[in-house]
Curated annotation (Swiss-Prot):
GO CC terms, sorted: plasma membrane
Coiled coil: none
Subcellular location, principal: membrane
Taxonomic path: Bacteria, Bacillati, Bacillota, Bacilli, Lactobacillales
Keywords from the UniProt entry: Aspartyl protease, Cell membrane, Hydrolase, Membrane, Protease, Transmembrane, Transmembrane helix
A molecular-function term among this protein's GO annotations: aspartic-type endopeptidase activity
Protein name: Lipoprotein signal peptidase
Entry's family note: Belongs to the peptidase A8 family.
Pathway stated in the Swiss-Prot or TrEMBL entry: Protein modification; lipoprotein biosynthesis (signal peptide cleavage)
InterPro entries linked: Peptidase_A8 (IPR001872)
Active-site residues per Swiss-Prot or TrEMBL entry: D114, D130
Pfam families: Peptidase_A8 (PF01252)
Assigned EC number: 3.4.23.36
Protein backbone atom coordinates (compact mmCIF):
# COMPACT_ATOMS: atom_id res chain seq x y z
CA UNK A 1 0.00 0.00 0.00
CA UNK A 2 1.44 3.36 -0.95
CA UNK A 3 2.28 5.79 1.82
CA UNK A 4 -0.25 8.36 0.63
CA UNK A 5 -3.07 5.79 0.52
CA UNK A 6 -2.10 4.53 3.98
CA UNK A 7 -2.22 8.03 5.48
CA UNK A 8 -5.50 8.87 3.73
CA UNK A 9 -7.03 5.59 4.95
CA UNK A 10 -5.78 6.30 8.47
CA UNK A 11 -7.37 9.75 8.47
CA UNK A 12 -10.64 8.36 7.08
CA UNK A 13 -10.84 5.55 9.66
CA UNK A 14 -10.10 7.85 12.60
CA UNK A 15 -12.63 10.38 11.29
CA UNK A 16 -15.28 7.65 10.99
CA UNK A 17 -14.65 6.61 14.59
CA UNK A 18 -14.80 10.17 15.89
CA UNK A 19 -17.92 11.00 13.86
CA UNK A 20 -19.70 7.92 15.22
CA UNK A 21 -18.87 9.04 18.77
CA UNK A 22 -19.99 12.62 18.07
CA UNK A 23 -23.28 11.33 16.67
CA UNK A 24 -23.93 9.13 19.71
CA UNK A 25 -23.24 11.96 22.17
CA UNK A 26 -25.49 14.29 20.14
CA UNK A 27 -28.43 11.89 19.73
CA UNK A 28 -28.48 9.45 22.65
CA UNK A 29 -28.54 10.26 26.37
CA UNK A 30 -25.91 8.70 28.63
CA UNK A 31 -27.07 5.17 29.47
CA UNK A 32 -29.98 5.25 27.00
CA UNK A 33 -30.50 2.21 24.77
CA UNK A 34 -31.86 2.57 21.22
CA UNK A 35 -32.44 -0.51 19.05
CA UNK A 36 -30.58 -0.18 15.76
CA UNK A 37 -31.27 -3.61 14.29
CA UNK A 38 -33.81 -5.09 16.74
CA UNK A 39 -32.55 -8.25 18.41
CA UNK A 40 -29.10 -7.85 16.89
CA UNK A 41 -27.53 -4.43 17.60
CA UNK A 42 -28.49 -1.60 19.93
CA UNK A 43 -26.83 1.76 20.40
CA UNK A 44 -26.03 2.67 24.00
CA UNK A 45 -24.05 5.74 25.04
CA UNK A 46 -21.50 4.68 27.66
CA UNK A 47 -18.47 6.49 29.10
CA UNK A 48 -15.74 3.89 29.67
CA UNK A 49 -12.97 4.86 32.11
CA UNK A 50 -11.21 1.52 31.63
CA UNK A 51 -10.29 -0.85 28.85
CA UNK A 52 -12.25 -3.67 27.26
CA UNK A 53 -14.90 -5.02 29.62
CA UNK A 54 -14.24 -1.91 31.77
CA UNK A 55 -11.09 -3.40 33.32
CA UNK A 56 -8.48 -1.10 34.89
CA UNK A 57 -11.00 1.66 35.63
CA UNK A 58 -9.56 5.18 36.05
CA UNK A 59 -6.03 4.25 34.93
CA UNK A 60 -5.86 6.75 32.05
CA UNK A 61 -2.11 7.33 32.44
CA UNK A 62 -1.54 3.60 31.84
CA UNK A 63 -3.61 3.59 28.64
CA UNK A 64 -1.91 6.74 27.34
CA UNK A 65 1.55 5.20 27.82
CA UNK A 66 0.56 1.83 26.29
CA UNK A 67 -1.16 3.52 23.33
CA UNK A 68 1.85 5.73 22.58
CA UNK A 69 4.18 2.72 22.75
CA UNK A 70 2.01 0.49 20.52
CA UNK A 71 1.31 3.18 17.91
CA UNK A 72 4.95 4.28 17.98
CA UNK A 73 6.20 0.74 17.46
CA UNK A 74 3.68 0.05 14.68
CA UNK A 75 4.76 3.20 12.82
CA UNK A 76 8.44 2.34 13.37
CA UNK A 77 7.83 -1.19 12.07
CA UNK A 78 6.09 0.14 8.96
CA UNK A 79 8.90 2.63 8.31
CA UNK A 80 11.65 0.02 8.68
CA UNK A 81 9.84 -2.71 6.71
CA UNK A 82 8.69 -0.97 3.51
CA UNK A 83 7.87 -4.20 1.65
CA UNK A 84 5.29 -5.72 3.99
CA UNK A 85 2.49 -7.66 2.38
CA UNK A 86 -0.87 -5.94 2.07
CA UNK A 87 -2.43 -7.98 4.90
CA UNK A 88 0.19 -6.94 7.44
CA UNK A 89 -0.12 -3.34 6.31
CA UNK A 90 -3.90 -3.53 6.70
CA UNK A 91 -3.54 -5.08 10.17
CA UNK A 92 -1.19 -2.29 11.28
CA UNK A 93 -3.44 0.36 9.69
CA UNK A 94 -6.39 -0.91 11.73
CA UNK A 95 -4.36 -1.14 14.95
CA UNK A 96 -2.98 2.38 14.54
CA UNK A 97 -6.40 3.81 13.58
CA UNK A 98 -8.14 2.18 16.53
CA UNK A 99 -5.42 3.26 18.91
CA UNK A 100 -5.59 6.86 17.72
CA UNK A 101 -9.40 6.92 17.86
CA UNK A 102 -9.51 5.86 21.51
CA UNK A 103 -6.41 7.94 22.34
CA UNK A 104 -8.21 11.10 21.18
CA UNK A 105 -11.08 10.30 23.57
CA UNK A 106 -8.75 9.63 26.50
CA UNK A 107 -6.86 12.90 26.02
CA UNK A 108 -9.94 15.00 25.31
CA UNK A 109 -12.44 13.46 27.72
CA UNK A 110 -10.49 11.22 30.15
CA UNK A 111 -12.74 8.32 29.06
CA UNK A 112 -13.65 6.47 25.87
CA UNK A 113 -17.11 6.72 24.31
CA UNK A 114 -18.60 3.27 23.68
CA UNK A 115 -21.89 2.67 21.89
CA UNK A 116 -22.26 -0.66 20.08
CA UNK A 117 -24.14 -3.36 21.99
CA UNK A 118 -24.66 -6.81 20.49
CA UNK A 119 -28.10 -7.89 21.69
CA UNK A 120 -27.78 -11.55 20.74
CA UNK A 121 -24.75 -12.27 22.95
CA UNK A 122 -23.62 -11.21 26.41
CA UNK A 123 -20.71 -8.99 25.37
CA UNK A 124 -19.24 -5.66 26.40
CA UNK A 125 -20.38 -2.43 24.76
CA UNK A 126 -17.68 -1.22 22.37
CA UNK A 127 -16.97 1.40 19.71
CA UNK A 128 -15.72 1.64 16.13
CA UNK A 129 -12.07 2.05 17.21
CA UNK A 130 -12.35 -1.12 19.31
CA UNK A 131 -13.57 -2.93 16.19
CA UNK A 132 -10.54 -1.70 14.23
CA UNK A 133 -8.21 -2.87 17.01
CA UNK A 134 -9.84 -6.28 17.29
CA UNK A 135 -9.85 -6.98 13.55
CA UNK A 136 -6.30 -5.60 13.21
CA UNK A 137 -4.90 -7.80 15.98
CA UNK A 138 -6.68 -10.91 14.66
CA UNK A 139 -5.39 -10.20 11.15
CA UNK A 140 -1.84 -9.64 12.45
CA UNK A 141 -1.92 -12.90 14.42
CA UNK A 142 -3.09 -14.76 11.29
CA UNK A 143 -0.29 -13.15 9.23
CA UNK A 144 2.34 -14.09 11.81
CA UNK A 145 0.93 -17.60 12.12
CA UNK A 146 1.03 -18.06 8.33
CA UNK A 147 4.62 -16.78 8.22
CA UNK A 148 5.58 -19.34 10.84
CA UNK A 149 3.86 -22.12 8.86
CA UNK A 150 5.76 -21.18 5.70
CA UNK A 151 9.06 -20.47 7.44
CA UNK A 152 9.24 -16.78 6.48
Amino acid sequence: MKKRLFVLSLILLVALDQLSKFWIVSHIALGEVKPFIPGIVSLTYLQNNGAAFSILQDQQWFFVVITVLVIGYAIYYLATHPHLNIWKQLALLLIISGGIGNFIDRLRLAYVIDMIHLDFVDFAIFNVADSYLTVGVILLVICLWKEEDYGN
